[in-house]
Structure formats: structure tokens, C-alpha cells
Amino acid sequence: MEVCPKCKGGGWITVRKSTPRSKFVYGDDRELEYAEKCDYCNGGEKQIVQDIRERANIPATYYDASIENFKWDIYLDEKGNVVDTSGQRKFVESFLENFEKWQEKGIGFYIHSKTRGTGKTFLASCICNSLMTKYKITTKFVSASNLINLSKEDRPGEKNPIDVMCECKVLVLDDIGQKMTGEEWMNDLLFKIIESRYQNKLVTLFTANAKCDELRGIDDRVTSRINKISQNIPLPEYSYRLKESNDEKRDFYKEMGLM
């Protein structure tokens, strides 16, 4: 973790200034030394957030993304009109503004669309990063297809990855339902994680390429729990990723004088 260059990680700095206390104690405006919260790292909060982020495993592409980066008006219909996403946006904004209340109920989001590249993982990352910045809470981002590998990990001196997923304040299970067909024991593992989080009212975010009741290889007890602990957030069937990629290339071509 990078140490604040100003306070050296202490969170406080010493300043000299004249205050009414100088006049009261000494009868003049002499400067006295005071301890103040470091204005560079906001009293150590930057280090705290950075440390939390490093352990969260957010995809590198979205490491610094926040909800302000998510463009709700980028989605277009077949006629080129902007798709109304005000309902989805309202839920996400309420979640970030009133997280403590959502946390009390243990309710997260099930973000889905059939089309790839619509911004499901991006939105989940934006939400996670915003939560870490605002509330300083521990989060964990896990690709569902990597659960198999994580369940086999055993690192001496480190907490079991499955226990971490069961206990972190916010868990993201990304791309759930992929590469799981026929894996009954994987359903058992998923149910164990989700059931533990349900019992302890811990918030979970899911992303998927299908509606919950259409997930491939996921049995009813798992989907039932997912429905119980998450609010449905459908994203329009429009490739956010392709639009952004095309926009970036177009800007580059303009810069090169090719357009």
C-alpha cells in the first residue's frame, strides 16, 4: 500500500498558525503548533480505501471506475432512441445513498442481460468502488467460473477463500451460470455461500447473461435464494462495450486526421 507522502501514513500533520488561543494565552498573534487531519490523504482515508481495493479483486480494467463513470444514456433502441433506464438508475442511486438500510435487509442486485458487453460487470465494479470509497467496507469480486479453483486453494496463514466470500460485507459473483452445467457439487458450493450470506444479511451482487430462472446448470434452491436476496436490474440489450470501443476508435481516427 502506498504511504501518504505528506503525513507518512499517520493521518495527521503538524501545522503552525495563529488562532484566538494565541491572543488569549500570550496576548499576541504568535503562531502555535496544532495537529490537523492530513489534507492530502484525508486523515488516512485514501490509504484505507486503497488497501480495501487491492484486496477486493476488482477487474483491472475497472479498478478506478465509479458510478459517475457509468453512462445510463448510452443505450439505444433499434431506431436509435435512448432507452429509458431511469428505473434501474433509481435503484442503484438509492442503494449507494442509503446503503445502511439496504444492508439491514441484506438485499443486493441481480444485474442481467442476454447481450454480452452491455456493462453488467462494469456496473457491478462501479457500485463496488463507490461503496468502498464512501463506506470503507470490505468487498470481494469473484468470477463464478473461478469458484472451482478458489475452492481448492489452501494457502498457509491465509483465510480460506470460500470463508472470505461468505463473510465479506459485499460480494460480487460475476457471470453466474457460465461453465457450470452438470456440476452438482458446484451448486452445493454456491448454495453454501449464498445461504450463509442470506442468514447473516450480507449484501451480494450478481451479474448474468440470463434471467435468474433461466440460468444454466443452477438448481432451484440456488435461484430461489438469489431471488430472495437481490433486486432485479435488467440492462438493455445493447452493447455498451462495442459502443465505447467504436467511440474510442473514432476519436483516435479524428486525431490522426483520418476522419
Indicate where each model-derived feature is located.
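Conserved RecA-like P-loop NTPase ATPase core
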Residues: C7, F70, S143, D174, ...
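Conserved alpha-helical scaffold flanking the Walker A/P-loop in AAA+ ATPase domains
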Residues: L96-E100, N149-L171, I176, D188-S196, ...
